[in-house]
């Protein structure tokens, strides 16, 4: 994929960039490594917090321009782009306010270990490579940058090739906020350059959010080099609705959960599992609301669903839906790419999917919802867990016993009861199974790239 800004609403390439040379990449790594030696020793949490708050101030002040840039590069609606920008600022503020406490020394009972002092200390690892996706250009990269910088690490960002201007903006705003030169750099490079960067002995660790194949590649390289990694990969999140649920609220949340970010979110609800007693009512209401969504120009504030980010994404989704229909699945609404310029695919609802169909196990990264009927809670959980992924999940029920079953038995990194899966700075984010390992956000996220050092003083 070329490093370029291409407008998904028109297919027009707006701006292209030249990839960094090997020498330029080496210089960036050297700059980061040299900066780390000083940054970790000679900056305090208070100083870093001042710069992080200044970063948030700038992001908020420039929200309209940055939102427009993200919409231009990857097609998210202008309303969701603006919300993402403000959320990114919130992430910087959260770590500015909480990093010192999250990474404070943890005392142990010194007497029990025969010491005068005994405690755990969290120390930064060094240069961390972040390989980030296009679907949340600022929030995803920012939620790496904020905890990494506050912990005393320095960052190298290899962003997706279709959001280069968003990537450059983040490095620029961090520098303008006062973080020292070399603390956070964007590398405009292709995916093929990642291996060389990660194998460089000056790079201590890596984090990747992206596809399963990309995660396998980075995980294998990091494993070979014995370097810690965090992988946040795909998801095929279940959304279960039981008879006691507030059906209208569940349906409206299901619609939002499926088409958020034009359906291109790892934690978007993708597989909808309705109890047999309310299945027909759920499907009718769901199809009605999905069909009524406004699809169009993402810069129009009235648009609810914009284009997919790439032509390849649109074509892959169309093929997945066509294959399911050919195998006997029923298309309740949508189901065909929209005519005209841009990479649009309409909100689509599919039922009558059987276990032998590819759609039963595949992740669909767009506004396509699969709906399943469950005879009881046991079957609902069985369907929910019938995936190689385990990122997020939703369950709707007022029955407390059912809530406990879902919390305990759904195989996922996150379970949201009577609500939509959302990432919050205050809560750890990540998955199990083939959705990856490690955690972002909250205290767990900032500690991922710290040396957990045991200190014993006799």
UniProtKB/Swiss-Prot annotation:
Enzyme kind, highest EC tier: oxidoreductase
Keywords on record: NADP, Oxidoreductase, Tricarboxylic acid cycle
Annotated SUPFAM superfamilies: ALDH-like
Entry EC number(s): 1.2.1.79
GO biological process, one term: tricarboxylic acid cycle
Function recorded in the entry: Catalyzes the NADP(+)-dependent oxidation of succinate semialdehyde to succinate. It is believed to be the main source of succinate semialdehyde dehydrogenase activity in Mycobacterium.
Protein's UniProt name: Succinate-semialdehyde dehydrogenase [NADP(+)] 1
Organism: Mycobacterium ulcerans (strain Agy99)
């Amino acid at each position: 994929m070329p490093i370029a800004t291409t407008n998904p609403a028109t297919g027009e390439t707006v701006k292209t960039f030249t990839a960094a040379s090997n020498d330029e990449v080496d210089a960036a790594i050297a700059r980061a490594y040299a900066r780390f030696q000083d940054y970790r020793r000679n900056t305090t949490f208070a100083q870093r917090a001042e710069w992080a708050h200044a970063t948030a101030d700038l992001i908020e002040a420039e929200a309209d321009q940055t939102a427009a840039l993200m919409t231009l590069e990857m097609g998210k609606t202008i309303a969701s782009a603006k919300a993402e920008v403000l959320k990114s600022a919130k992430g910087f503020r959260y770590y500015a306010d909480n990093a010192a406490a999250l990474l404070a020394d943890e005392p142990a009972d010194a007497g029990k270990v025969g010491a005068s002092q005994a405690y755990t200390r969290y120390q930064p690892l060094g240069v961390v490579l972040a390989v980030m996706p296009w679907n949340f250009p600022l929030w995803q990269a920012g939620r790496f940058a904020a905890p990494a910088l506050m912990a005393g690490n320095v960052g190298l960002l290899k962003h997706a090739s279709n959001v280069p201007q968003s990537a450059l903006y983040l490095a620029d705003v961090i520098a303008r906020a006062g973080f020292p030169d070399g603390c956070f750099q964007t590398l405009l490079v292709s995916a093929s350059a990642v291996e060389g960067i990660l194998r460089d002995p000056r790079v201590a660790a890596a984090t990747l959010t992206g596809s399963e194949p990309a995660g396998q590649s980075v995980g294998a390289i990091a494993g070979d080099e014995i370097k810690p990694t965090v992988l946040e990969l795909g998801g095929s999140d279940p959304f279960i609705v039981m008879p006691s649920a507030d059906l209208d609220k569940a349906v409206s949340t299901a619609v939002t959960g499926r088409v958020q970010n034009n359906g291109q979110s790892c934690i978007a609800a993708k597989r909808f599992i309705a109890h047999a007693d309310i299945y027909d009512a759920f499907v009718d209401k769901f199809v009605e609301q999905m069909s009524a969504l406004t699809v169009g120009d993402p810069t129009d504030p009235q648009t609810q669903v914009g284009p997919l980010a790439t032509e390849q994404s649109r074509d892959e989704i169309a093929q997945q839906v066509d294959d399911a229909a050919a195998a006997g699945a029923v298309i309740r609404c949508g189901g065909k790419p929209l005519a005209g310029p841009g990479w649009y695919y309409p909100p689509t609802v599919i039922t009558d999917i059987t276990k032998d169909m590819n759609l039963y196990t595949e992740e669909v990264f767009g506004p396509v919802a699969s709906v399943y009927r469950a005879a009881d809670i046991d079957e609902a959980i069985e369907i929910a867990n019938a995936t190689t992924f385990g990122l997020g999940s939703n369950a709707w029920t007022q029955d407390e016993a059912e809530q406990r079953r879902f919390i305990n038995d759904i195989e996922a990194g996150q379970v949201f009861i009577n609500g939509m899966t959302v990432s919050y700075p205050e809560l750890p984010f990540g998955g199990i199974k083939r959705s990856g390992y490690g955690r972002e956000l909250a205290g767990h996220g900032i500690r991922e790239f710290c040396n957990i050092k045991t200190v014993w003083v006799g």
